[in-house]
Amino acid sequence: MSILWRNDNGTLISCVEKIKVMDQNMAELKSVIQDIIDDGVLMGVAEQQIKEEILKLLATMTSQY
């Protein structure tokens, strides 16, 4: 399932290349997050805490543009 990407005004992004880049970035992010969760669980860290820390980190991030 592909995400319907929107701009700040809520208009759908229609550029195929932009959508492709965003979808690829999300796939890469999912893979990295899965690695973090798997590594943490294998080392005995609570899965819920890992997810909470990832969300905290995300909440601190803003666009550099």
What are these regions, as identified by a protein language model?
Residues 1-34, 60-64:
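N-terminal acidic leader/helix
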Residues 32-64:
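Short, charge-rich amphipathic interface segments used for partner binding and complex assembly
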